[in-house]
């Protein structure tokens, strides 16, 4: 019988954890990165590795930055090969996963929902 929920395997979770540690280390040191990322504090919110371990989707959120979303994406994509090489040196696998960066809209969506709830005329129907 097929599972209805998709769960990550132990290998996917382990690889995502290693990639997260490596990305944090690289972002702290600032080595091998595009110069635009030096003064751009980023948070890696989550990493999702595909079932075949070939692709790692890395979600990030910038804090207090002067750079636009497109500039950050361009800088991360310019540094992608150096980051992948650094990850390759840390893992013991036949293939190193391709790194893809995505902006995490979770924080923006939470702020929008909070504003909608504050500004709405939502009333508890049980109190009427």
UniProtKB/Swiss-Prot annotation:
This is Ribosome-binding factor A. It comes from the Bacteria. The gene is rbfA. It holds the Pfam family RBFA. InterPro entries: KH_dom-like_a/b, RbfA, RbfA_dom_sf, Ribosome-bd_factorA_CS. The keyword Cytoplasm applies. Its main location: cytoplasm. One of its GO terms (molecular function) is ribosomal small subunit binding. GO terms for cellular component: cytosol. The keyword Cytoplasm applies. Monomer. Binds 30S ribosomal subunits, but not 50S ribosomal subunits or 70S ribosomes. One of its GO terms (biological process) is maturation of SSU-rRNA. Keywords: Cytoplasm, Ribosome biogenesis. It is found in: Cytoplasm. One of several proteins that assist in the late maturation steps of the functional core of the 30S ribosomal subunit. Associates with free 30S ribosomal subunits (but not with 30S subunits that are part of 70S ribosomes or polysomes). Required for efficient processing of 16S rRNA. May interact with the 5'-terminal helix region of 16S rRNA. Belongs to the RbfA family.
């Amino acid at each position: 019988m097929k599972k209805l929920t998709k769960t990550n395997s132990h290998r996917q979770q382990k690889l995502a954890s290693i990639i997260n540690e490596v990305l944090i280390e690289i972002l702290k040191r600032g080595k091998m990165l595009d110069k635009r990322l030096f003064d751009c504090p980023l948070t890696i919110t989550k990493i999702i590795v595909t079932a075949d371990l070939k692709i790692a989707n890395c979600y990030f959120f910038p804090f207090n930055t002067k750079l636009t979303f497109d500039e950050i994406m361009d800088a991360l994509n310019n540094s992608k090969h150096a980051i992948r090489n650094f990850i390759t040196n840390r893992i013991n696998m036949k293939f190193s996963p391709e790194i893809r960066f995505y902006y995490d809209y979770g924080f923006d969506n939470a702020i929008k929902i909070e504003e909608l709830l504050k500004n709405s005329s939502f009333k508890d129907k049980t109190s009427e």
